[in-house]
């Protein structure tokens, strides 16, 4: 069970990500997410995110920050004038990095 507001927010995000990946963003209700996260208060999602759109934006932003870090590290190794081939390979490597974790795979299923 979450100990504080940050834990609850992370738990809601984790469950939303998993459920969106499995069933689709539009097939999952806010109530299903709060129940899966063990929240008795149905308005927990609105309390932490304001709107469903903010939940989705937060979920996508959370993962994109990690991908931006990986992308920046890989770009730093390419030099000043990377070829198109190198840039395409870099993009493939960035998204392939998601395949190393279950939540990364969930993210790819959502944005697909």
Give the ranges of each region predicted by the language model:
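Hydrophobic alpha-helical connector segments
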Residues: 72-107
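An amphipathic alpha-helix adjacent to DNA-recognition modules
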Residues: 9-14, 49-76
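Residue-level signal for short amphipathic helical patches enriched in basic/charged
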Residues: 40, 62, 102
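Generic alpha-helical secondary-structure signal
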Residues: 11, 36, 58, 87-90
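Basic, helix-initiating cap at the start of DNA-binding domains
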Residues: 1-23, 32, 54
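Short, intrinsically disordered, charge-balanced linker/junction segments flanking boundaries
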Residues: 109-112
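Short alpha-helical functional segments enriched in proximate histidine and acidic residues
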Residues: 19, 66, 98
């Amino acid at each position: 069970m979450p100990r504080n507001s940050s834990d609850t927010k992370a738990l809601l995000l984790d469950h939303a990500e998993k459920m969106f990946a499995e069933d689709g963003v539009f097939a999952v209700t806010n109530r299903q997410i709060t129940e899966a996260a063990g929240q008795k208060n149905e308005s927990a999602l609105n309390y932490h995110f304001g709107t469903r759109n903010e939940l989705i934006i937060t979920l996508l932003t959370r993962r994109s920050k990690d991908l931006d870090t990986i992308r920046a590290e890989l770009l730093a190794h390419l030099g000043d004038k990377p070829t198109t081939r190198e840039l395409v390979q870099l993009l493939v490597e960035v998204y392939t990095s998601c395949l190393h974790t279950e939540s990364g795979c969930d993210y790819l299923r959502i944005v697909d």
